[in-house]
Amino acid sequence: MSALEKSMHLGRLPSRPPLPGSGGSQSGAKMRMGPGRKRDFTPVPWSQYFESMEDVEVENETGKDTFRVYKSGSEGPVLLLLHGGGHSALSWAVFTAAIISRVQCRIVALDLRGHGETKVKNSEDLSAETMAKDVGNVVEAMYGDLPPPVMLIGHSMGGAIAVHTAAANLVPSLLGLCMIDVVEGTAMDALNSMQNFLRGRPKTFKSLENAIEWSVKSGQIRNLESARVSMVGQVKQCEGITSPEGSKSIVEGIIEEEEEDEEGSESVNKRKKEDDMETKKDHPYTWRIELAKTEKYWDGWFRGLSNLFLSCPIPKLLLLAGVDRLDKDLTIGQMQGKFQMQVLPQCGHAVHEDAPDKVAEAVATFLIRHRFAEPIGGFQCVFPGC
């Protein structure tokens, strides 16, 4: 998925590198580059891809919440981008540069609650209803009673939230809807394996460079350019750590669990706390959100999603990494012409990160086809065959 959502499709990706903990060679060996193949894993700032950043204040019953958005463009419809679980708005960085060069549009990439730099009173409430309301509230806070035309584009969990937002009519100026690699049937089938996937990820990283390297070599993000900006939004410094210490060799793909001996419980707990502190010192970065704790919301994100998507009375686009992801309802709907679909092969679950140019072409073609936006830079539409 992203972490969480990536696991939904893990077994269906044909050319996936082995994940840490899955028995692949990466899980037991240190990550090393061959001679002459060293790559740059240093993080890249958001400002290389977005024009500006804004913290949008939203008033509610409990006070004020602040939602981080990244923006580009000044004309055309607003493409409101919703990331997948565990990711952040920065996962759209490379896509943003690609789409802005093809059509006249405005980009608003949003950090959903509990993710990225968004700060809310109750960051643990990740229900579909709450997050959909957040999206509507952010649009209202940014544009008032007369918002510009908006197209919702969401990846995985973000795609589900986009559909819930559209179905509840929370964005009155909505003109289009796009889901990226999220299908109810596949998602529901994968619910039982999500916790196992999350347990297989590293818990900490010694540096941002280490986190970026892991994301690429594990197959979470196959595009190094995107990983260098995207992973910054997925990890944070551990609490109580002010600066990274040491410069030890790259951490292995998995932080192996400590073996428990037969000491008394007090001794074990004391040793565990000491070990945790040492781990934080050597590996001061961890995930921004503990996805395992959001399990009670997973079913609500995806159950009934296909029919909800089909029921939205606006032009719709579905982008998939593989045609085998279609469930029965979407297969019938696609045959009936209820939405446009395009398959982008040779991508992982993070389609918009792995192939940002192809996703930008698909979205730009969709916008021009429906006369929602004007092409720029001599962009030529290429209509898909399905």
Swiss-Prot record:
InterPro entries (alphabetical): AB_hydrolase_1, AB_hydrolase_fold, Epox_hydrolase-like, PPase_methylesterase_euk
Enzyme class label: hydrolase
Organism of this sequence: Mus musculus
Quaternary assembly: Binds PPP2CA and PPP2CB.
Modified residues (Phosphoserine): 15
Positions of post-translational Omega-N-methylarginine modification: 16
EC number: 3.1.1.89
Protein name as catalogued: Protein phosphatase methylesterase 1
